[in-house]
Amino acid sequence: MALTPSVCSISDVQGLQKDRTFHPSLWGDFFLTYQPPTAPKHAYMAERAEVLKEEVRKMVKSANEIQNILDLILTLQRLGLDNHYENEINELLSFVHDSDYDDKDLNLVSLRFYLLRKHGYDVSSDVFKCFQDKEGNFVVKDTKSLLSLYNAAHLRIHGEEVLDEAIIFTRGKLESVLDSLETTLADEVTLALQTPLFRRVRILETRNYIPIYEKEVARNEVILEFAKLNFNLLQLLYCEELKMITLWWKQLNVETNLSFIRDRIVEMHFWMTGACSEKKYSLTRTITTKMTAYITILDDIMDTHSTTEEAMLLAEAIYRCEENAAELLPEYMKDFYLYLLKTFDSVKHELGPNRSFRVFYLKELLKILVRGYSQEIKWRDEHYVPETIDEHLEVSKATVGAFQVACSSFVGMGDIITKEILDWLLSYPKLLKSMTTFVRLSNDIASTKREQTGGHHASTVQCYMMQHGTTIHDACEKIKELTEDTWKDMMKLYLTPTEQPKVIIQTVLDFARTAEFMYKKTDAFTFSHTIKDTIALLFVEPTLV
């Protein structure tokens, strides 16, 4: 494998690394001042939500017409209420799958396809072919059907040309009619064109959809009130978590000891909440936020700040994971490293005696990470650009951090996650390879201009430019095509029967959704001012009941 011309010189690398700074935290101690509602008020909210939940359950159980069933399930999903009725929804979808329906109604066909595929039914996309004319264009009479087809088509797998064609057709049509639509439908179309329904971060979809649903003429007031209370109760829990995590973060004293890193603890919790938003995943959010904090610190030390020698010493200490390894490290790394070991011990305590063995996997995940970082440092120092994207991804998909964060999320879950499942996850199965490839490619598109000037190893974008002699624009467009391919890969795996619990693939897909959100327009984690309003919407602004 021949060395290619350097992206930048070693002296440039070292100089830029030492001078690099990121903007400070946008949140500081904001969540330390959080005051929960009084106990009576919280109790009233919880009791009222419980009453409404059972009223909605009656609606779910009494639904018996295909269109009404589909509309109800979609509404509950978008409002973040579907997890309260999993068994009932599964029964209804089984009924829908086995029942006759009007296959000439494009809106119904699209919604049926969308919900069945979303729940793992491998239904055929051939149902859409009858809506095409001789030229291959779709015959669609109304915008609602157009939007339903657009959303359904994004649950495609490889080889489904009818869905590929549907996306191109519907996107063009929706863009052309957007300015003429009434407000509520225009809001829906705008959201869809930004991110199709299946790929949206679920808790953000809930927060965004509540005010849209409130404007709908056909809204159900009981469902609406329950959705608002359910979200507000979750928001209170998130704020409690943020208060504890901010206190934990302050003890690390990053402003003094690690002033060069990205101080993004609130954004980290936001990211983890996007992937694991349910009440029962509180411990999961806490563990994964802390793991993400350490991944960020390791990344910023090894990729941006340290010398090669310092980075290798840190890697060796991570491999050892023992207190006396701190003696190897430069002074600025020692406190962080010892705090990492302390965190492992505290997580053991939080997990309890029957699940404390899982901390072993957190340590192994960090070892895999720094092994990859070490290889990337070698590439950088040798001025090496991998000859193909595949060669690049063999290392870089493991260093984007998505593998570590996704796997660590399962450490905090219930007894459904066994040692055998954690061993399987650590073996890097196809599902995780597809997801981490997607995250790496998305990250590289968003970060490539910044990292071109920052003394980094070559990204997949630069690798493609070197391999094919293209411009940065053309390379980014090609990488975007590859991200679409990874979505198809993940969808195929989602539809493939497996012995693993459904929560595994659902969570992995949720991490892909959060990554798409974070890297959609820029690297929103690094430049977090771009998502400050969204974070406030999720954590600070309750819905008005």
Curated annotation (Swiss-Prot):
Similarity comment: family membership: Belongs to the terpene synthase family.
The protein's name: Beta-sesquiphellandrene synthase
Coiled-coil stretches: none
Entry binding sites for Mg(2+) 1: D299, D303
InterPro entries: Isoprenoid_synthase_dom_sf (IPR008949), Terpene_cyclase-like_1_C (IPR034741), Terpene_cyclase_plant_C1 (IPR044814), Terpene_synth_N (IPR001906), Terpene_synth_N_sf (IPR036965), Terpene_synthase-like (IPR050148), Terpene_synthase_metal-bd (IPR005630), Terpenoid_cyclase/PrenylTrfase (IPR008930)
EC number(s) on file: 4.2.3.123
Residues at which Mg(2+) 3 binds: N443, S447, E451
Organism listed in the record: Sorghum bicolor
GO terms assigned for molecular function: beta-sesquiphellandrene synthase activity; magnesium ion binding; terpene synthase activity
Keyword list, A-Z: Cytoplasm, Lyase, Magnesium, Manganese, Metal-binding, Plant defense
Protein function: Sesquiterpene synthase converting farnesyl diphosphate into beta-sesquiphellandrene and six minor products, zingiberene, 7-epi-sesquithujene, sesquisabinene A, (E)-alpha-bergamotene, (E)-beta-farnesene and beta-bisabolene. Can also accept geranyl diphosphate as substrate, producing nine monoterpenes, with myrcene and limonene as the major products.
Catalytic reaction equation(s): (2E,6E)-farnesyl diphosphate = beta-sesquiphellandrene + diphosphate
GO-annotated biological processes: defense response; diterpenoid biosynthetic process
Cofactor requirements of the protein: Mg(2+); Mn(2+)
CDD domains linked: Terpene_cyclase_plant_C1 (cd00684)
Cellular location(s): Cytoplasm
Enzyme class, broadest EC rank: lyase
Regulation: induction: Up-regulated by herbivory.
Effect of Y373S: Increased production of (E)-alpha-bergamotene and (E)-beta-farnesene
Motif (DDXXD motif): 299-303
Involved pathway(s): Secondary metabolite biosynthesis; terpenoid biosynthesis
Recorded GO CC terms: cytoplasm
